[in-house]
Regions:
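Short, surface-exposed coil-to-beta transition loops
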Residues: 50-56, 80-85
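Hydrophobic ligand-binding cavity/cleft-lining segments
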Residues: 1-35
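Short amphipathic beta-strand and strand-loop transition segments with alternating hydrophobic
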Residues: 21-31, 58-60, 85-89
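Beta-strand/loop substructures that line and gate deep hydrophobic ligand-binding cavities in soluble
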Residues: 70-117
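Short beta-strand segments that buttress and anchor functional surface loops
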Residues: 36-45, 69-76
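Surface-exposed, charged secondary-structure patches
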Residues: 41-44, 54, 59
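A conserved amphipathic terminal alpha-helix motif
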Residues: 102-143
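A generic structural micro-feature
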Residues: 32, 47-49, 76-80
């Protein structure tokens, strides 16, 4: 499961069809996230352009080697901070997965926060389905 978290393909799968991410810089997504900044174009429901965002990937170190962490400390012209920390830990034959998100968007923060709540609820449903199916992406094409 942790290997899946490292892939843009998983982001695409769990965000769809609510949000789509198209790479701008670099022009293609890597197979696995490397630390760095990835500019993307966002579309709501795959059709309505809602701007661009920087996905800023790091892999924070933790004292407990059993805990995996991936941070997207992203931002956009309207959202000064979209700090998303994923932690995952193998526990009793399963995986304990957590999302933590901090958002700052000035006067737009309440609206962005509401959208984020809806988006992460959607992601969690999609995650659960994928995990239950052994991360079988079906006919979706790799990014």
């Amino acid at each position: 499961m942790i290997a899946q978290v490292r892939t843009p393909r998983l982001l695409h799968q769990v965000a769809s069809p609510l949000l789509s991410f198209s790479p701008l810089t670099p022009v293609e997504f890597p197979g696995t996230w490397s630390e760095g900044t990835y500019w993307v174009k966002l579309k709501l429901f795959g059709v309505l352009p809602i701007g661009r965002q920087a996905i800023v990937i790091t892999y924070p170190q933790t004292e407990n080697a059993q805990i995996f962490m991936l941070r997207d400390n992203g931002y956009s012209p309207l959202i000064s901070k979209w700090d998303h920390l994923i932690t995952a830990q193998e526990v009793n034959g399963g995986t304990l997965y957590r999302d933590s998100v901090t958002i700052k968007a000035g006067v737009l923060t309440p609206f962005v926060w509401l959208f984020a709540r809806l988006f992460y609820a959607h992601r969690q449903r999609r995650w659960a389905t994928l995990a239950a199916n052994g991360f079988n992406y079906g006919n979706s094409q790799p990014l």
